[in-house]
Curated annotation (Swiss-Prot):
Record-annotated KH type-2 domain positions: 17-86
GO molecular function, one term: rRNA binding
Protein known as: Small ribosomal subunit protein uS3
GO cellular component, one term: cytosolic small ribosomal subunit
Family annotation (HAMAP family): Ribosomal_uS3_A (MF_01309_A)
GO BP annotation list: translation
Keyword DNA-binding: no
Similarity section: Belongs to the universal ribosomal protein uS3 family.
Keyword Ribosomal protein: yes
The organism of origin for this protein: Pyrococcus horikoshii (strain ATCC 700860 / DSM 12428 / JCM 9974 / NBRC 100139 / OT-3)
Biological classification of the source: Archaea, Methanobacteriati, Methanobacteriota, Thermococci, Thermococcales
Length: 210
């Protein structure tokens, strides 16, 4: 039980760090992180489309992030390694954040979703799925799913081959959840796939969206 509590605590901590970095590094094209324990402390790999923004002038921002990770989140001797995302259009986290930013700028949710989906597919993705959940058009909350191409949906392939990302858009009507899943060009297609040759859209129930 103690081991289970430890892993739960570490998972929650990583989630909180991810949320913090998403807010702090939106302009950097933040694409997620990986935390690894080492004999010397904690290695934190930050993936970003613009590593220079994460590092900051003279390394100022990365030093500040290091202090926050140590003092606020309790990481032992954190060592930050910033890795560049070669193609942000194939990183689901980056795309989820960009869609959220578009919604916050007042762009209609369908336009934001289809624009992102088109750009993702044009960059070679085998498939993409975008889910927007919340008060999209009025007082009633709903979830709309946009999808195209080939996407592993279940089992190990869905966990290992598909890039997944989540972000939130803060609007006057409330919070809009943005989920993005992308199957990259080099993914080997499993048996369990969904094939949609043309862009499609459907409204799904709130329960299903969860």
């Amino acid at each position: 039980m103690a081991i289970e509590r430890y892993f739960i605590r570490e998972a929650v901590k990583e989630m909180l760090i991810d949320e913090f970095l998403e807010k702090e590094l939106r302009r950097a094209g933040y694409g997620g992180l990986d935390i690894k324990k080492t004999p010397l402390g904690t290695k934190v790999i930050i993936f970003a489309a613009n590593p220079g923004y994460v590092i900051g002038r003279g390394g100022r921002r990365i030093r500040e992030l290091t202090r926050i990770l140590e003092r606020q989140f309790g990481l032992e001797n954190p060592q930050i390694d910033v890795q560049e995302i070669k193609n942000p259009y194939l990183n689901a986290k980056v795309q989820a954040v960009r869609i959220a930013q578009a919604l916050e700028r007042g762009i209609h949710f369908r336009r934001a979703a289809y624009s992102a989906m088109r750009a993702i597919m044009n960059n070679g993705a085998r498939g993409v799925e975008i889910r927007l959940s919340g008060k999209l058009t009025g007082e009633r909350a709903k979830s709309v799913r946009f999808y195209q191409g080939y996407l592993a949906k279940v089992g190990n392939p869905a966990e290992t081959l598909v890039s997944k990302g989540y972000a939130q858009a803060l609007l006057k009507l409330g919070v809009i959840g943005v989920k993005v899943a992308i199957m990259p060009p080099d993914a080997r297609l499993p048996d369990e796939i969904e094939i949609v040759e043309k862009p499609a859209e459907e409204e799904v129930s709130t329960n299903e969206a969860e």
